[in-house]
């Protein structure tokens, strides 16, 4: 009996260790030639045709929501390195990220929060000069769309009441956007039924 218990305990520990190591490929984006995605908190790039993924970042912190520039040469992304979640920019080949935003720390500012992290990169303007991101100013339950220049100038709020994921029309004259942000709501974490055993 003791041997059976010990075997089950060891097997359970091995399964638990494997579960801790399991990580998801998240937040993919493409420029038509490559795909950039987050794995274990770092950014990777892989050819759209397949092949080996290249690790682009290895910083202490988390990178997510990467978006290629219209010319496909730069990547804007959201990262949390020092407690604040901010917008960063780097070449598509990797390198040292350039911080573009400097915002106040929100109490609830992580990927596990039901409202999601702050300063999520949404898209680029068609001319490649600005990056749109969603900011949850004042730690609120609604997000506002902001634009920051790739030169790092002062961000500007778009004249919209609320905003979430968005995309420009091919000519860059119109912006389609979601007013409600629900991508991190707790009901999306549902893992099973409510039926009796």
Protein language model regions, located:
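Positively charged n-region of N-terminal signal peptides that target proteins for export
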Residues: 1-4
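Hydrophobic h-region of N-terminal signal peptides that target proteins for export
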Residues: 8-17
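A flexible loop/linker signature enriched in serine peptidases of the S9 family
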Residues: 19-20, 38-44, 59-63, 78-88, ...
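Mature N-terminal segment immediately following signal peptide/propeptide cleavage
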Residues: 20-48
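Short coil/turn segments that connect the beta-strands within blades of beta-propeller domains
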Residues: 32-33, 71-73, 127-129, 171-173
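Beta-propeller domains with acidic blade repeats across secreted/periplasmic ectodomains
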Residues: 55-56
